From Swiss-Prot:
It comes from Chlamydia pneumoniae. GO terms for biological process: arginyl-tRNA aminoacylation. It comes from the Bacteria. InterPro entries: aa-tRNA-synth_I_CS, Arg-tRNA-ligase, Arg-tRNA-synth_N, Arg-tRNA-synth_N_sf, ArgRS_core, DALR_anticod-bd, Rossmann-like_a/b/a_fold, tRNAsynth_Ia_anticodon-bd. It catalyses: tRNA(Arg) + L-arginine + ATP = L-arginyl-tRNA(Arg) + AMP + diphosphate. Pfam families: Arg_tRNA_synt_N, DALR_1, tRNA-synt_1d. This is Arginine--tRNA ligase. The keyword ATP-binding applies. Coiled coil: none annotated. GO terms for molecular function: arginine-tRNA ligase activity; ATP binding. Its main location: cytoplasm. Its EC number is 6.1.1.19.
């Protein structure tokens, strides 16, 4: 389905070409109107063309308008110096709603589906997932859902940190201090003890380094301990993924170990390596620091692994696009990785995107930590969110049974955390506040969920299980027109999210849609109205778009609150 924006862009492009035939390939810039009295969309190109054509903007606007067709508009007007405002006719909006109804079922499929790899979450073995993993996990999951929805083939990868010198240290400690480590909390505690030994005891450090060599040589005893450590950690990670409703395929750093020597050999053959302080590096003119791919002791590092992963994803997974979701602090590393992969011929420009994100802050504007200064454990944060949701339900809905509260609280709590994160621009830091994220008003998950529940209430009052999408609709009132227009902008929100890799475009859209639905609900009565069928059609579309949009954000719906 063509979006309203794309339809209008074609119409304006043709009008500009007719008005100014000597102007080559001018792409008009169309934007939604900032205020309702300016119509539905606005074209500001007359101001830009004034510099090119050496004419007054208003005269240019008048020339463009003279070439515009009457259909599908009810009003075209020139405002101010030369802004062209467009208002679509109710007949056209009704027709588009019929097309939209069908396209919504299919997912607004792209014409050329691609293989997309999204690398997200990526916790480290033997360590608790913390609040920093929250952003990577839910941003990556939302992007994966959206790319899949529009028809792309998405491979979700979890690049778990399951290799390196830290494992030699932990294996040594467990060999010398046998104990139970079937729980991640035990393992995390043991990791801290092992680190103290590694830091303060030179002999322990030597034995740890020997165990790294043993692990790389696939010594049976070292491998057995390593596998048990990984198994314990992954079970704990999966519990969190189950709570968050995350599906992701594990492919840890260790997967790429067999390819690391070949990477170094290939870079040497291509003349890309320079020895610096006994380490092998790739230097780039655009960067002040090199990309080190082999340490001075001959060992590999995460840069080597990331380069091998990039090559594998292109050559073996046949990815058309690779997206890695991590904090912004790793931006330079990924810029160097991309530059090196391009120089080595593994990657073409424009295929890789690093989706960086900002910090999660406490109410004082500092990085969210525990009182002891440690990272907040993600599992504890999620459990607290559910507890807070239970408290809110008991306060506002005292008539609910314990069973009803236990059913609804996890949905409300997890929705609140996800939406609070996704509604913030991903590159910005945001303040984590349970009090704000659980509000019924404002840009919150509860605000969206309440509108969805309202629609379920309409169905119960009418004694029906499903709203009819039998058309055609008949737009009569301003509130209906605003709701229809907003519904039709759903694919535009998806396009913006995909283009910028920022889920907040979708949250902003759903927040706006909820506002428009609430206005419609207030002003457009359904029962005993001659327009009941048409208004129920709009309710049905609003229900589907809200449910779909929330699903794409990883949120769940409820029939009742």
């Amino acid at each position: 389905m063509s979006t309203l924006l794309s339809i209008l862009s074609v119409i304006c492009s043709q009008a500009i070409a007719k008005a100014f035939p000597n102007l080559e390939d001018w792409a008009p810039e169309i934007t939604p109107s900032t205020k309702e009295h300016f119509g539905h969309y606005q074209c500001n190109d007359a101001m830009k063309l004034a510099r090119v054509l050496k004419k007054a903007p208003r005269a240019i606007a008048e020339a463009i308008v003279a070439e515009l067709p009457q259909e599908p508009f009810s009003l075209i007007e020139i405002a101010g110096a030369g802004f062209i405002n467009f208002t679509f006719s109710p007949v056209f909006l009704n027709q588009q709603l019929e097309h939209f109804k069908d396209a919504l079922k299919l997912g607004f499929q792209v014409s050329q589906p691609k293989k997309i790899i999204i690398d997200f979450s990526s916790p480290n073995i033997a360590k608790d997932m913390h609040v920093g993993h929250l952003r990577s996990t839910i941003i990556g999951d939302s992007l994966a859902r959206i790319f899949s929805y529009v028809g792309h083939d998405v491979l979700r990868l979890n690049h778990i940190g399951d290799w390196g010198t830290a494992f030699g240290m932990l294996i040594t400690y467990l060999q010398e201090n046998p104990c139970d480590y079937s729980d991640l909390e035990d393992l995390t505690s043991l990791y801290k003890k092992a680190y103290v030994c590694f830091t303060n005891d030179e002999e322990f450090k030597k034995r740890s380094q020997q165990n790294v060599v043993a692990l790389q040589a696939k010594d049976p005893q070292a491998i057995a301990i390593w596998e048990k450590i990984c198994e314990t950690s992954e079970k704990a990670f999966q519990k969190i993924y189950d709570i968050l409703d995350i599906v992701v395929e594990k492919r840890g750093e260790s997967f790429y170990n067999p390819f690391l020597p070949e990477i170094i050999e290939d870079l040497e053959k291509k003349g890309l390596l320079t020895v610096s302080n006994d380490a092998k590096c790739v230097f780039h003119e655009a960067f002040s620091i090199p990309f080190m791919v082999q340490k001075s002791d001959g060992g590999y590092n995460y840069a080597t692994t990331d380069l091998a992963a990039m090559r594998y994803r292109i050559e073996e997974d046949h990815a058309d696009k690779i997206i890695i979701v991590t904090d912004l602090g790793q931006s330079l590393h990924f810029q160097l990785l991309e530059a090196t992969a391009i120089a080595a011929g593994y990657l073409q420009p424009g295929i890789f995107s690093h989706v960086g994100f900002g910090l999660v802050l406490d109410p004082q504007g500092k990085k969210l930590k525990t009182r002891s200064g440690e990272n907040v454990k993600l599992r504890e944060l999620l459990d607290t969110a559910i507890e807070k949701a239970e408290e809110a339900l008991r306060e506002h809905r005292p008539e609910l049974t314990d069973e009803a509260i236990q059913e609804r609280a996890p949905v409300i709590g997890i929705n609140a955390i996800k939406y609070s994160d996704l509604s913030s621009h991903r590159t910005s830091d945001y303040v984590f506040s349970f009090e704000k994220m659980l509000r019924f008003e404002g840009n919150t998950a509860m605000f969206l969920l309440y509108a969805y529940v309202r629609i379920q209430g309409i169905k119960r009052r009418l004694g029906i299980s499903q709203l009819s999408l039998e058309g055609p609709p008949e737009i009569q009132e301003p509130a209906e027109e605003l709701l229809a227009l907003t519904l039709l902008r759903f694919p535009e929100a998806l396009e913006s999210t995909i283009k910028e890799l920022c889920p907040h475009f979708l949250t902003d859209y759903l927040y706006n849609l909820t506002h428009k639905f609430n206005g419609f609900f207030r002003d457009s009565h359904i029962q005993d109205s001659p327009y009941a069928k048409s208004r129920l059609f709009l309710c049905a579309l609003a229900e589907q778009v809200l449910a779909t949009g929330m699903h794409l954000l990883g949120l769940k719906t409820l029939e009742r609150l």
